[in-house]
């Protein structure tokens, strides 16, 4: 998907009131941590693992991937311009610009927007003005569309949190469907503790069911990440 900046855009019209109310649900954080239980499946395999996630707002995203018995298989480090991945099982590492994320998700984005996505917030794109489309299935539907992509969001009318979102890449025939469930309160704001993500990339289909646990907000974190001298650099990594 073409790169979409998260620059501020002037909101107007009926969509503005719903978007502003939705983004009022964003927690005020500098540091965020959670353990995410992941059930993953695609055309070829199914596996369960845990992702330990740590973030510093607008600065860094760190993920430790852990299998059964807490055995760590790899780590991911994302900065504002780069992504680094190490696979401890194969002794390999990857180093790429942040645009590499488009291989993992049908969206090419910047770090602040990726953090908003992980936290379950309404996404803003500077090259597509949002438009309110009325009620659909008793949910407020907002659409942002450009020649390259379309972002459909459905908001609960009670508190304007996200119920569903669909991000479609028209150019590459990719689509991501996300549902948001099990809302609780974190730092006085609504937070979705359970997500279901379906991704279609050409003939490939994958699903991830996420359950957020052990959430910590504004506790100072560290982000240990070391590429060992014996590790081999590769162009792509699969765990």
Each model region followed by its residue ranges:
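Gly/Pro-enriched, hydrophobic low-complexity segments
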Residues: 130-239
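Extended beta-sheet lipid-handling architectures
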Residues: 31-36, 48, 64, 78-80, ...
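An acidic-aromatic
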Residues: 61-112
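Edge/loop elements at the starts and ends of beta-strands within beta-rich repeat scaffolds
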Residues: 24-32, 43-47, 54, 58-59, ...
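N-terminal leader/targeting segments and the immediate start of mature chains
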Residues: 1-46, 236-239
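Hydrophobic lipid-interacting interfaces of membrane-associated proteins
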Residues: 39-41, 68, 185, 202
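C-terminal low-complexity, charged extensions that often adopt amphipathic alpha-helices
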Residues: 104-107, 115-135
């Amino acid at each position: 998907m073409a790169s979409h900046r998260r620059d501020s855009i002037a909101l107007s019209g009926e969509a503005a009131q719903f978007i502003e109310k939705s983004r009022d649900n964003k927690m005020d954080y500098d540091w965020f941590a959670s353990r995410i239980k992941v059930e993953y499946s695609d055309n070829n395999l199914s596996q369960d693992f845990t992702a330990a996630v740590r973030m510093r707002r607008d600065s860094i995203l760190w993920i430790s991937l852990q299998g059964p018995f807490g055995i760590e298989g790899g780590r991911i480090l994302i900065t504002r311009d780069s992504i680094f991945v190490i696979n401890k099982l194969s002794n390999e590492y990857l180093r790429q610009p942040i645009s590499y994320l488009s291989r993992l998700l049908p969206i090419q984005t910047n770090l602040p927007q990726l953090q908003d996505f992980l936290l379950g917030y309404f996404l803003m794109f500077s090259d597509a003005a949002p438009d309110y489309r009325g009620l659909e299935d008793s949910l407020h539907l907002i659409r942002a569309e450009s020649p390259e992509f379309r972002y459909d969001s459905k908001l609960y009318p009670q508190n304007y949190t996200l119920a569903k979102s669909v991000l479609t890449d028209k150019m590459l025939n990719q689509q991501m469907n996300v549902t948001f469930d099990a809302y609780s309160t974190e730092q006085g704001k609504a937070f979705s503790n359970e997500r279901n993500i379906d991704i279609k990339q050409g003939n490939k289909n994958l699903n991830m069911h996420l359950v957020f646990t052990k959430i910590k907000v504004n506790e100072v974190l560290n982000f240990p990440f070391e590429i060992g001298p014996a590790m081999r650099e590769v162009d792509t990594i699969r765990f």
